[in-house]
């Protein structure tokens, strides 16, 4: 139950969904489960009427992995017909296979996608070709760094710091080179912020609102704080 919960949390899903899934599994196993869920940790207790078991679990980083989330939901939905007849070892082996699922796209592809998106935002915010090019390069490198560090399970704020720093340095470096070679003016620095837009965490913003609406205050406030600090 706890492992399924922490795996769901690692996919970026909200506390209400994690708790609902843990309760579904607990009910099928004849247990009662209470859980305190945050952005990156779960403290839960399971009761069987005679004994209880408590455990605290935590993550080093958070992100979004819809492929893994989909497989976990299938596992939970089929648990009543398949999972209850499996041994503990078989269940953990099945979860091991799910845990190995990575995102559909490589860091290179995600970096290129972020570059296109931030370049487009630069255009929408009134930037010209110079700003768009610099933001494209900065965002691409920055998101590539963030994805690579995330795959190696570095801490959340180290990933944010390193990726934003990379984006800023690439933008500033390209801008200085273009000033020397092409003689562009200082006013083109307006696209500097656009090179960091990839770091804005839209998913935690959405899930924080859902958690707060369901009065899950701890998770909602932690997600909202993370989203604001990331900006």
Regions found by a protein language model. Name each.
Residues 1-89, 97:
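Soluble N-terminal domains of membrane-associated systems
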Residues 4, 191-195, 227:
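Hydrophobic alpha-helical transmembrane segments of multi-pass small-molecule transporters/permeases
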Residues 13, 17-20, 67-70, 86-93, ...:
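Conserved active-site and cofactor/substrate-binding residues in soluble primary-metabolism enzymes
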Residues 61-117, 122-127, 131, 225-231:
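Alpha-helical transmembrane segments and their cytosolic membrane-interface
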Residues 103-207:
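Core alpha-helical transmembrane segments of integral membrane proteins
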Residues 154, 185-186, 211-223:
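Juxtamembrane helix-boundary/capping and inter-helix hinge elements in multi-pass membrane proteins
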């Amino acid at each position: 139950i706890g492992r399924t919960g922490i795996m769901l949390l690692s996919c970026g899903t909200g506390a209400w969904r994690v708790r609902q899934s843990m309760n579904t599994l607990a009910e099928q196993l004849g247990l009662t489960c209470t859980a305190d869920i945050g952005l990156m940790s779960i403290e839960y207790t399971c009761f069987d009427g005679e004994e209880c078991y408590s455990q605290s679990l935590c993550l080093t980083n958070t992100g979004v992995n819809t492929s893994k989330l989909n497989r976990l939901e299938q596992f939970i939905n089929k648990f009543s017909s398949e999972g209850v007849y499996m041994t503990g070892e078989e269940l953990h082996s099945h979860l091991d296979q799910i845990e190995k699922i990575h995102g559909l796209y490589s860091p290179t592809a995600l970096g290129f996608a972020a570059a296109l998106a931030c370049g487009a935002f630069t255009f929408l915010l009134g930037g010209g070709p110079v700003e768009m090019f610099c933001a494209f390069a900065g965002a691409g490198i920055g998101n590539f760094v963030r994805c690579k560090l995330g795959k190696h399970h570095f801490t959340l704020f180290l990933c944010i710091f390193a990726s934003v720093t990379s984006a800023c340095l690439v933008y500033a470096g390209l801008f200085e080179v273009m000033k020397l070679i092409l003689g562009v003016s200082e006013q083109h620095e307006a696209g500097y912020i656009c090179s960091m837009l990839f770091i804005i965490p839209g998913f935690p913003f959405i899930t924080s609102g859902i958690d707060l609406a369901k009065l899950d205050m701890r998770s909602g406030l932690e997600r909202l704080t993370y989203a604001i600090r990331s900006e």
